């Protein structure tokens, strides 16, 4: 992949964050048990200019009730072993899907979901927190 393509048309999400390119690394299927492989995937994305990392608390859920939060936990292990990577990414995650409800975008639920995401990813802040499929 051409690094210039990934970095073209970068934009700022806010003044406190570095600009992000038009492509993000989506972690929906980021479930490998191999931390080295997971770390390499993140480093490769960064090397290609993809600094926006998109996660969600529900990523990893098998809809049989297992796996909720596993993609965030994996990223947490990667960032624990390679903490220098945290400063190289703009970290986005989502909350609001609450199996079996399925959606809960109440402020109480989202506050707790965000706090749980911080713990799972072993970070002090999330750069962009989004409501995942809001119930309107």
Residue ranges and their predicted role:
Residues 26-37, 95-111:
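Active-site mouth loops of central-metabolism enzymes
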Residues 1-89:
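N-terminal binding-site loop/beta-alpha segment at the start of enzyme catalytic domains
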Residues 98-136:
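Glycine/proline-rich, positively charged
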Residues 74-78, 90, 94, 109-116:
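Generic beta-strand or strand-like secondary-structure segments
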Residues 25, 55, 93, 128-131:
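Conserved beta-strand positions
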Residues 58-59, 82-107, 132:
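Structural motif corresponding to the early beta-alpha repeats
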């Amino acid at each position: 992949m051409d690094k210039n393509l990934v970095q073209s048309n970068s934009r700022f999400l806010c003044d406190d964050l570095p600009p992000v390119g038009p492509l993000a690394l989506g972690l929906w299927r980021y479930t490998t048990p191999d931390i080295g492989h997971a770390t390499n995937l993140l480093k490769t994305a960064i090397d290609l200019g993809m600094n926006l990392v998109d996660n969600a608390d529900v990523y990893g859920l098998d809809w049989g009730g297992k796996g909720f939060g596993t993609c965030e936990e994996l990223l947490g292990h990667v960032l624990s072993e390679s903490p220098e990577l945290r400063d190289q990414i703009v970290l986005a995650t989502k909350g609001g899907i609450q199996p079996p409800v399925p959606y809960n975008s109440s402020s109480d639920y989202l506050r707790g979901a965000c706090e749980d995401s911080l713990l799972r990813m072993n970070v002090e802040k999330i750069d962009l927190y989004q409501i995942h499929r809001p119930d309107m």
